[in-house]
From Swiss-Prot:
It comes from the Bacteria. ATP binds at residues 27-32. It catalyses: cytidine(34) in tRNA(Ile2) + L-lysine + ATP = lysidine(34) in tRNA(Ile2) + AMP + diphosphate + H(+). Keywords: ATP-binding, Cytoplasm, Ligase, Nucleotide-binding, tRNA processing. It comes from Vibrio parahaemolyticus serotype O3:K6 (strain RIMD 2210633). One of its GO terms (molecular function) is ATP binding. This is tRNA(Ile)-lysidine synthase. The keyword Protein transport does not apply. Belongs to the tRNA(Ile)-lysidine synthase family. The N-terminal region contains the highly conserved SGGXDS motif, predicted to be a P-loop motif involved in ATP binding. GO terms for biological process: tRNA modification. InterPro entries: Lysidine-tRNA-synth_C, Rossmann-like_a/b/a_fold, TilS/TtcA_N, tRNA_Ile_lys_synt, tRNA_Ile_lys_synt_N, tRNA_Ile_lys_synt_subst-bd.
Length: 438
């Protein structure tokens, strides 16, 4: 236990800063159970704020029992614990493993504020399994990098303190100090790829090559170093290609080799937290989207969104529901939360650049996203035009034209966020501020 705690402390000391909250992903399995115990001791020695989160996937009839046990164990450790219930769309065609993982991290992200640490219990055996799964998929160096000890997550940092520790050492330590934990029956089901590797393949590899865990960790680390070097070497090129609106310049891409183009597109999508495309999809992005006829409106659908082209730039467009039927009333200096994670909208009276004159009955101000049939007379234009025409003049991509907030007074357009104020409502009372998500 002592050597494992010293290893745990060393990792946490690397990332922990005063006033940092530490959140532990707590499933109740042996890995996270020991992780909670290590955190309990570290907390007593360092007096930090801690919280545990159990994610209830609803996949096992025992999940309620596990949730109760986790809350009891967390209370015994003096650490608060939340239970997050998630719903999985099992008819989506995606694997249960992937759905559960994505839902789990979405739930955990809700508990992370800027600068916080999220601790997860992945260990050396998990690393071997992840490496082999990436190999099975035909992944390149990025996929074969497997899991890093730390990575940015939800404004904080995800840390894996047990990544260099084997499962057998974790189980032996937990038994020696008298810990109880839960056993998820699904972990025995070898129909799942990870379980197949865990129960049938990795034991054989370990018996034949006892140092396989260290070898995999070394290969994963070398792959990660190669990835970091490529990013470093192409950093200045990527900076020129990336535009202020987070689009990617096709002109900048065109002067480089196909290999560099593919890498730059991957760097771009990684920056936008999008799933990585396959080799085939990368070729299609360039051949069918970037190089499409100038009068075309090309797009390539991927899992989380689609790649579009506009004015010789590539755009990543996430899937969003239609918001044109949505309306919301807005009040002075009170942020209005927009639907579909489109940010907030505020009529700020304390702005240094006021450009809107408030109408006689500001309580009638409302926000819509539907430009259909609306006209406006921007202060920079000589006459009124349909919003459809104005969007074209202001170079707004077609897919964004129904995702831009329109401030209305009765049936009149007051302003279109980030574009213009109607001449009738031009003044110095307030400013319309649209804070978009990062």
């Amino acid at each position: 236990m002592e050597s494992l705690y010293q290893q745990f402390s060393h990792v946490l000391n690397t990332y922990y800063q005063p006033q940092t909250k530490v959140v532990v992903a707590f499933s109740g399995g042996v890995d996270s159970r020991l992780l909670l115990e290590l955190l309990r001791r570290y907390r007593e020695e360092n007096s930090l704020s801690c919280h545990a989160v159990y994610v209830h996937h609803g996949l096992s009839e025992n999940a309620d029992i596990w949730a109760d046990k986790c809350q009891v164990w967390a209370k015994q450790a003096g650490i608060s614990c939340s239970v997050e219930r998630v719903n999985l769309d099992t008819n989506s065609g995606e694997s249960i493993e992937l759905l559960a993982r994505e839902a789990r991290y979405e739930a955990l992200a809700r508990h992370i504020n800027r600068g916080d640490l999220l601790l997860t219990g992945q260990h050396a055996d998990d690393q071997v399994e992840t490496f082999l799964l990436a190999l099975k998929r035909g992944s390149g160096p990025k996929g074969l990098s497997s899991m890093a000890e730390s990575m940015p997550f939800a404004g904080g940092t995800l840390v894996r303190p047990l990544l260099n520790t084997k499962r057998e050492q974790i189980e032996a330590t937990a038994k020696n100090i008298g810990l109880e934990w839960v056993e998820d029956e699904s972990n025995q089901d070898t129909r799942y790829d990870r379980n197949f590797l865990r129960h049938r393949i990795v034991p054989e590899l370990s018996e034949r090559w006892p140092s396989i865990h260290q070898a995999v960790q070394r290969s994963a680390s070398l792959c990660a170093q190669q990835e970091a070097l490529l990013d470093e070497l192409l950093g200045s090129v990527f900076a020129r290609a990336l535009q202020a609106d987070l689009s990617l310049s096709i002109d900048e891409l065109a002067i480089h080799s196909e290999l560099a183009q593919a890498r730059l597109i991957r760097m771009w999508l990684s920056k936008l937290n999008a799933n990585m495309p396959s080799q085939t999809q990368l070729r299609l992005i360039w051949q069918e989207v970037a190089l499409a006829q100038q009068d075309a409106n090309p797009k390539l659908k991927l899992k989380q969104g689609e790649i579009r082209r506009f004015q010789n730039k590539l755009y990543w467009v996430t899937h969003r529901a239609d918001v044109t039927s949505w309306q919301g009333h807005i009040q002075i200096d009170e942020p209005l939360i927009l639907p579909e994670s489109l940010g907030t909208l505020t009529l700020s009276s304390g702005s240094h650049q006021p450009n809107i004159s408030l109408p006689s009955h500001p309580e009638l101000l409302r926000v819509t996203f539907n430009p259909e049939g609306l006209s406006a007379h921007p202060t920079t234009r000589s006459r009124s035009r349909k919003l459809k025409k104005l969007f074209q003049e202001y170079n707004v991509p077609s897919w964004l034209r129904r995702q831009i907030p329109i401030l209305m007074y009765k049936d009149q357009v007051v302003a279109v966020a980030d574009l213009f104020v109607d001449q009738t409502f031009s003044g110095q009372d307030c400013e319309l501020i649209w804070r978009k998500p990062l």
